[in-house]
């Protein structure tokens, strides 16, 4: 009986390859959960994601040409009046005060609210925000970062304008006499708040023209009309007391005198409440609405 000789096989050839072993899942079929202390989960992960979003929004603002335009406008609104005042004073003014130096704050507020609104609305309308939706863990991260970066950028623009105005007064004008830092502190808080409010309105309306027009009309037209109506009709008085533009003016010490004077802390809390409400509406719209 013929038999076929057995093939020579090495031990390695006789053994079948086994797949790589993976850790068994716990009983119940649930995968192991990440620890909240790991870099990718919990509060640390959220802070890391917000940090990346802040860096991204900062790069966007620094690399678009419109930022330079808004910087020139906001800074010009601050030092422009000082240039004219210094050149036209003719030696009749002994010195300017800090309140005189900040006379252009109202115009700067309108410019930065347009800056914040146009930036947030433009991101959504152009579809750029879709990249943030795909790369970030939460839809809200990009908008929170945009609000923070817009507020900080607006404060920088404002302070640059103040510094240029101070330089003009010191070099060309009669000099500057200090009358307290309240106008400057109130101006910075108002500038940052209005830039953040503008970003919230931009995310809420998602239309660049409407997002810029609504807050500008509110500050220039509606608030003045409500103030005038409150002096004649008592029913408008409660509304006039909490207007954001009015409270920012009271906070910086340049109020109209047509509303109740609260402490600076109360004025700041009212302005912050407006910021939280409007940005909250913007965050809600950002989470619920899709982008094209």
Residue ranges of model-derived segments:
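Helix-capping/transition residues at the boundaries of transmembrane alpha-helices
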Residues: 60, 121, 132-134, 198, ...
């Amino acid at each position: 009986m013929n038999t076929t000789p057995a093939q020579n096989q090495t031990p390695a050839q006789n053994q079948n390859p086994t797949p790589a072993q993976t850790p068994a899942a716990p009983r119940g079929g649930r995968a192991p959960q990440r620890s909240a202390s790991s870099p990718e989960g919990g509060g640390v992960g959220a802070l890391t994601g917000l940090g990346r979003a802040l860096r991204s929004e900062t790069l966007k603002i620094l690399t678009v040409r419109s930022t330079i335009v808004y910087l020139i406008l906001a800074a010009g609104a601050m030092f422009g009046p000082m240039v004219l005042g210094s050149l036209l004073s003719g030696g009749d003014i002994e010195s300017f005060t800090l309140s005189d130096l900040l006379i252009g704050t109202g115009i700067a507020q309108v410019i930065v609210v347009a800056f914040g609104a146009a930036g947030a609305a433009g991101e959504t309308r152009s579809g750029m925000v879709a990249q943030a939706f795909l790369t970030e863990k939460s839809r809200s991260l990009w908008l929170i970062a945009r609000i923070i970066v817009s507020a900080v950028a607006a404060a920088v623009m404002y302070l640059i304008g103040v510094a240029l105005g101070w330089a003009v007064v010191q070099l060309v004008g009669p000099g500057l006499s200090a009358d307290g830092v309240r106008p400057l502190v109130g101006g910075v808080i108002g500038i940052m708040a209005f830039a953040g409010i503008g970003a919230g309105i931009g995310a809420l309306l998602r239309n660049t023209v409407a997002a810029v027009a609504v807050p500008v009309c509110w500050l220039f037209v509606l608030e003045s009309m409500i103030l005038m109506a409150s002096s004649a009709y008592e029913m408008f008085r409660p509304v006039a007391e909490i207007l954001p533009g009015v409270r920012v003016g009271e906070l910086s010490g340049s109020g109209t005198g047509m509303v109740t004077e609260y402490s600076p802390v109360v004025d700041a809390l009212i302005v912050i409440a407006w910021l939280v409400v409007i940005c909250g509406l913007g965050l809600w719209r950002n989470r619920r609405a899709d982008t094209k």
